[in-house]
Regions:
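Phosphate-binding/catalytic loops
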Residues: 77, 83-136
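Conserved active-site segments centered on acidic
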Residues: 1-68
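Conserved small-residue
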Residues: 11, 52, 78-79, 118
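Alpha-helix C-terminal capping/helix-to-coil transition sites in glycosyltransferase folds
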Residues: 72-74
Length: 136
């Protein structure tokens, strides 16, 4: 089982959306995603919950999680969300950084654009690694 960790500082927006899209698109027998942050916020941003609900994904009960060594153990890839020097680093883990704006406090139209960019990047990652769900 391949594990991808999507991480940002607060684990309340971008990384939550990315993990949710990944788990919707990837074959659960081949890969899964977790999301985490170095300084988890109290809840997922309301505007993120709203725009994800629009595409059929419910994040209303999702809780920000701290990125720990235990969580990272066994992961194949860490994808950070453009948080610059504050992005988490896990020694020995392959890392990619997606330079995406933080959706916190942005108008819903901007959060939708961020959501759509994340969905596009996640779909490309899943396809490139060969982790997509097989057609029934």
């Amino acid at each position: 089982m391949n594990t991808v960790i999507f991480a940002c500082v607060h684990n309340a927006g971008r990384s939550q959306m990315a993990a949710a899209f990944f788990n919707a698109l990837a074959d659960p027998e081949r890969a899964r995603a977790l999301s985490a942050g170095t300084q988890p916020g109290p809840h997922v941003h309301p505007e993120v919950v709203t725009v994800m609900r629009e595409v059929g994904i419910d994040l209303s009960s999702a809780q920000p999680t701290r990125l720990t060594a235990d969580l990272a153990r066994g992961a194949e890839l860490l994808v950070t969300m453009g948080c610059g020097e504050t992005c988490p680093i896990v020694p020995g883990l392959e890392r990619d950084d997606w330079n995406l704006p933080d959706p916190k406090g942005r108008p819903v139209a901007e959060v939708r654009a961020i959501r759509d960019e994340i969905r596009t990047r996640v779909a490309a990652l899943v396809a490139t690694r060969g982790w997509q769900r097989m057609a029934a």
